[in-house]
Design a protein with these regions (language model features):
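Short acidic alpha-helix that forms the nucleotide-activated donor recognition element
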Residues: 45-53
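Intrinsically disordered, low-complexity, charge-rich segments with an acidic bias
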Residues: 205-221
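Catalytic binding pocket for nucleotide-activated donors in carbohydrate/polymer assembly enzymes
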Residues: 52-53, 60-195
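A short, well-ordered alpha-helix in the C-terminal region of glycosyltransferases
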Residues: 194-203
Length: 233
């Protein structure tokens, strides 16, 4: 993860992750089976190790906020199943592999934009009316978290989510939890998991063919540039 020095809430989120990692590591019943690891200064070198090892790729930007990233494509081409919002390149992947072969959740871009235009998104109302959402958010300032982390940072993040939540995290939270539960259940079904893993690189869906074509075009262009460079020298 990375965050600009002045991006206070982003730093608070990183602190939340580190605190959660500490809490889980201290739990003797949970720690043998679950780890939370924050990968610092994520870059290409780290990606080369992490992407091939990934089982489920979570691409969970708020719909309408992601222009179009390529990270999800790299995970997908290495056999990871995508779980994400209908945002960025997730939309194209869903169209190519079919809705049955990708886990999507959350509001659409049009719905999110409408909330911004009407200024009618109310995080506090969602927090107060949905017990599951309240339970998740309250855990941020639970005793176990406050004892392990910095209370000022955790309380500031809690207040930001309940009082503002500019990126509408609570809007998609329930849908995310339900969709992830389905993904994990399907992963336990080895035959379903293998079906999804095989589907992604399949030429039937044109994804790999498109990628090969792009790679060949890219390599040809680079080769031309290199040849021209040596001719100049």
């Amino acid at each position: 993860a990375k965050a600009a020095p002045a991006y206070t809430i982003a730093k608070d989120i990183i602190h939340l992750i580190l605190t959660l990692s500490k809490v889980i590591e201290a739990d003797k019943d949970v720690s043998p089976y679950l780890k939370v690891v924050l990968v610092q200064n994520y870059n290409v070198t780290l990606a080369e190790k992490l992407i091939p090892a990934c089982d489920i790729s979570e691409q969970i930007s708020l719909a309408s906020k992601e222009a179009s990233g390529t990270g999800n494509m790299k995970f997908m081409l290495n056999g990871a199943v995508t779980l994400g919002t209908m945002d960025g390149a997730n939309v194209e992947i869903a169209e190519l592999v079919g809705k049955d072969n990708i886990y999507t959740f959350g509001a659409t871009s049009d719905e999110v934009i409408a909330h911004y235009e009407k200024c009618d998104y109310n995080a506090k109302k969602l927090y107060e009316t949905d017990a599951l959402i309240k339970k998740c958010v309250d855990f941020i300032i639970s005793d176990v978290m406050l004892q392990a982390g910095d209370s000022h940072s955790l309380n500031r993040l809690y207040n930001e989510i309940v009082g503002k939540d500019w990126f509408m995290a609570l809007l998609d939270l329930r849908s995310y939890i339900e969709t992830k539960e389905k993904a994990l259940t399907d992963y336990d079904d080895i035959f379903q998991a293998h079906h999804l893993i095989v589907i992604y690189p399949s030429p039937e869906y044109n994804i790999q063919n498109h990628t090969h074509q792009r790679n060949r075009k890219y390599n040809n262009q680079i080769e031309t540039v290199v040849i021209c460079f040596f001719h100049i020298i």
